[in-house]
Amino acid sequence: MKKIAAVESFFSPEHRAAIEKAAAECGFAVDYFTQGHLPADQAADYEIIYGMCPPQELKAAANLKWLCCSFAGVDAYTDETIYPNPDVLLSNSSGAYGITISEHILMVTLMMLRQMPKFEEIVKNREWEKGLSMRSICGSSITVLGTGDIGTNFARRAKALGAKVIRGVRRTKKAGDPAYDEMYTFEELDSVLPKTEILVMALPATKETNHILSRERIALLPEDAYVVNVGRGSAIDQEALMEALNGGHLAGAALDVCVPEPLPKDHPLWDTKNLLLTPHISGNMSLGITRDLDVELFCEDLRNYAAGRRLKRLVDRKIGY
C-alpha cells in the first residue's frame, strides 16, 4: 500500500483520525514521526510527506511525489536540488494561519497606536502619567502589502474597526476581497506609501519581494506612519528601517520576522527605538483552530491528489508561493 509520512508533533487523536480516514479513502497508510525528523532509512517508503521535514532530509525520500508543508512560508523548499527528482509537487498550508497571524497584527498595531510600550515603562516606574497622545485604527489609512490569506484576514478586521481606507498591494492587479477599498500592484507601491498611516507586510520571501520596502520607499512613508511585518524579514531593508526608527522618521514598527533568525544577542535591532520585536511567533501552531485548519486543508488536498485534481495550495517554485 502507498504510504504517507506525517512529520508533526501537534496531532491530536482527532487529527490522526481525520488524516487516517482521508488516507484510507485514497488508498494510503499513514506513519507518524516527530516534527522535523524523518529517519533516512525509512524515507524512501513514502510517496507523500506532510508536516515539517527539514530540506536536507528530502533527498533520502527517493519515491517522494508530494511534499505538503504544515506552514505557509516555503522559501526554504523552492530549490529543486533538495528533492530526489524535479517533479515533486510542493504545497503549503496557506489558509490555516490567517486567523492567528491577523490577530497578532491587530494586537501589535493597537499596542503601538495606544502607546502601550511607553505606558508599560511608566507603570513599571510606578508613575501615573496620562499625557501620551494615542491614535485609532478607526479613520486610519492602511496599506496591506501582500493580500493573501493573512493580509486579507487582517484587512477584514481593520475594516470592521472602522479604517477609513484599506489599500491592497499585490504582484498582479486582480480583484481583491471586499475589505479592500483600492487595489494596486507592486509597481504602484511608490504612489501608495505617502498616503499610508499603517503599513502591514505579509509577503513570502521571493526575488521580487526582497527589500521591497527599500531605503527609498521607507523615506516615502509619513513620519507618523507605523510598519508591521509578519511575512519575511528579507522584505525590508532592515538597516534603513533601524535608522528611520532611531532618527524619528517613523512612529514605530512591529517585526515578527527579521534577518537573521534567530537574532544574535548583540544585534542592534534589539536596541532600536520604538520597535516591538517578537521571535517569529505570530503563526505559532499552539492555537487549536490553526491546527484543525492545517489538518483539514491537508485532507482536502489529499483527496484532490488521489483523484488527479490540481492541489488547491500548490506552490509554484519559480515564484515562491
Give the residues covered by each predicted segment.
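Phosphate-coordination loops involved in phosphoryl transfer and adenosine-cofactor binding
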Residues: 1, 138-141, 224
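C-terminal helix-to-coil terminal segments
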Residues: 89-104, 118, 261-321
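Glycine-rich NAD(P)-binding loop of Rossmann-like domains
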Residues: 89, 119-153, 182
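N-terminal glycine-/charge-rich "phosphate-binding" loop or analogous flexible N-terminal tail
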Residues: 1-48
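Short acidic low-complexity segments
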Residues: 33-42, 55-59, 179-195
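Phosphate/diphosphate ligand-binding glycine-rich loop within oxidoreductases
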Residues: 44-123, 131-134
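Rossmann-like adenosine-cofactor binding region
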Residues: 172-268
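Short, polar loop motifs at secondary-structure junctions
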Residues: 35-37, 52-56, 74, 168-174
